[in-house]
Amino acid sequence: MKSISTYDFKGKRALIRVDFNVPLNKETLAVTDDTRIRAAIPTIKKVLEGGGSVVLMSHLGRPKNIPEDKFSLKNCISTIEKYLGFPIQFATDCIGERAFEKSAALKPGEVLLLENLRFHQREEKGDRGYAEMLSKHGDCYINDAFGTAHRAHASTTIVAEFFPNDKMFGYLLEKEIHSVDKVLNSHEKPLTAIVGGAKVSSKITIITKLLDKVDNLIIGGGMAYTFIKAQGGKVGKSLVEEDHLQTAIDIMRIAKEKGVTILLPVDTIYADEFSDSANMKEGKIGEIPDGWMGLDIAKESIEIFRKVILDSKLILWNGPMGVFEMKNFQKGTLEIAKAVAEATKKGAFTLVGGGDSVAAVNQFGLADEVSHVSTGGGAMLEYLEGVELPGIAAILK
């Protein structure tokens, strides 16, 4: 494995696996959140400043293995050009004859974007022949796509085999690994994890893993109601996973045995329907009337969580506190985001990861006020769980 910081790119074509799987406007197909594109720019610029040229490859969405306009990476061109400050080239088929002509003719300082890798079904199958064809676009390989590092696809894992002495992580992937390692391996205390989102079932592994590391575990979002019901609370028609009530009890027992403080909401904003125009009330979380559902944490919970966050030296946040997409139920998530930003100012290392909490800090304009916002939802969770990620292992081999 080489290091991007010391590698000599002069006269070389760098094949970079980026993660440009960005949301697009359904009508105009314009990029609506360019976080992932912005995050890849430092790696691209490093190659160009070192006298090399760049071939970018990525997937976008879940096409049915055939070209579709709504999944075309041409929709990202103007955004990439905006951040690079010059025009780039585009190849309409990542392994078409024209694509190879274009990549072979690249001059130092030039950038070529290949069309969506998933327009070929061989990408997700991790096909070796497909990976070998892709490898012909570059003299060295850089993986900078943390968002797909947990997938053993042709462009994320197999292609690395064809660059045994010329493969490396990009700056973004390096930073992602460093940030998670810092949370998992640092001896700074207290370490607080904030876990939200809808379902306990999707977070069991991560919570179990975190109980070995954290001092405090704050639980919010839809999953909190499963914990409250497991303790005998009345939660009305709030989201509850009936088949995971015992799981919640087990988690609380293990936390107690390990000396971890679990903090659950004590009050909630509840509504008579899942709508921004619903009737709303505020009350104790274990006393929600029948026919009503909890959709956000309320004042007292915010204050309790805030105090713990501000006293922490390391903070991991994964998952919102309520239905933050609706204005009436976003205050809990907004206030927790503000507290995490404030803790960062006080010197805490703060890592935000997982689709919805990332969307929240972006929506509230606080992404630049935390230490690191992870671009890899599933990949970050799997890495935190201690799973070996194929995209990372392929570079380290």
Task: Give the residues covered by each predicted segment.
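Active-site loop-to-helix "anion-binding N-cap" substructures in soluble metabolic enzymes
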Residues: M1-K397
